[in-house]
Curated annotation (Swiss-Prot):
Entry binding sites for Mg(2+): 271, 280
Keywords, alphabetical: ATP-binding, Magnesium, Manganese, Metal-binding, Nucleotide-binding, Nucleotidyltransferase, Transferase
Name of the protein: Protein nucleotidyltransferase YdiU
Secretion signal, residue range per the UniProt entry: none
Cofactors that this protein relies on: Mg(2+); Mn(2+)
Family: Belongs to the SELO family.
Natural source organism: Burkholderia pseudomallei (strain 1106a)
Root EC class: transferase
Annotated ATP binding sites: 109, 111-112, 131, 143-144, 194, 201, 280
Amino acid sequence: MSFSRSEAAPAAPLPDLAATLAAPRDDAFQQLGAAFVTRLPAAPLPAPYVVGFSDDAARMLGLEPALRDAPGFAELFCGNPTRDWPQASLPYASVYSGHQFGVWAGQLGDGRALTIGELAHDGRRYELQLKGAGRTPYSRMGDGRAVLRSSIREFLCSEAMHHLGIPTTRALAVIGSDQPVVREEIETSAVVTRVAQSFVRFGHFEHFFANDRPEQLRALADHVIERFYPACRDADDPYLALLAEATRRTAELVAQWQAVGFCHGVMNTDNMSILGLTIDYGPFGFIDAFDAKHVCNHSDTQGRYAYRMQPRIAHWNCFCLAQALLPLIGLHRDAPSEDARAERAVEDAHAVLGRFPEQFGPALERAMRAKLGLALEREGDAALANQLLEIMDASHADFTLTFRHLARVSKHDARGDAPVRDLFIDRDAFDRWANLYRARLSEEARDDASRAAAMNRVNPKYVLRNHLAETAIRRAKEKDFSEVERLAAVLRRPFDEQLEHDAYAALPPDWASTLEVSCSS
């Protein structure tokens, strides 16, 4: 398989795209006003070059993949031309606040991200945002830059999560530069173009609530409802309905994270999408040797965002969103007094938040049932899945390979057990569980082959393990971007065998255990 690009690729209409982005802005979020955004050009990035590009994300935007080869592509998607755009067309950074590691952090905002415009395709509108585009009024002590290392990780994981079927922001491109930036060591700059229908976060609502700006809070909620939750308009209480939908999406999202062993790493409220998307890929990680207490973020010394904590933290974050929406809940109903409205709003919000476990639990159970190849629903299925996770935890069995190899287990006998059994230190514990599993499989009408095929459609063979990303990053630092492309291509087909790429599905090498990721990016 070749990952080189044809020199005969047709020229893409880059001037048309640049003109579209530079045209006077009509995207809805920036029209909310100066209380929400600050316009400014991107900081110049010297001698930019393309590190990675997603053909799939380009097609989603209605762009031709050949666009990446057009002269000026790297310049456009690091933001350099924005210095010449008219004031009405300038990119913008948005302001928000939030709780970080459970503590109110006050005003935050897009400290290094600029939204450069919207593109519409197939009835949807997408915002394009440049992460690493320079300082903004919300940069605090930061330099506004992103580094090559973290940009490649975000690019790869955004696309990997999409192809796993998990709601996520997307990534169109990574643009690099030799410009040095200081982190824990000297690194080089990069800009990742991320794409989403909206980058509105829980923290946007928290900001206007905390600053006692009810008009802006309502305008923001109305924008989100009108654009993304139109069904909420017809509810008895549109703002309560918004909270309910955002909470449901969040619960279902985290269930999907748990089902693939994904750890976000920094589940601050300013990193929570109002649309229920995975957003802000920083010190994330897919679990290798399973540990329910696994913490992927080296900076998270208290383990607040450990794998097992993610559902609880997501629920807590929804409480923060609910608090921010309280001034709006009940405004459409008659109430004898403001105190009565506020009291009823608290009751209604608590009722919505109380449904989170009822939404998360069944969503995770459905996912785990599918991962075990169980088409029928039985009362003991959740216990069977939990027992598997417990023995995986005790043996530190590889998360991804355990579920992938389970497809080889036969309902009739133990002859197919070896590949998954060998992942366990305590093989007697696995044998005991496997006997329970086989007994449960005997209740299913599907034969082994049909069940295995169904399991392989939900249990990925390939995930973005840290050592795979690290290998691509090390080569990219030497100006060899072929591994970024190769790895991205493999991750676009996570459920396929791709036998020529078996090495990407192997157990991590010993050196992978020394890798640490943190908030430094």
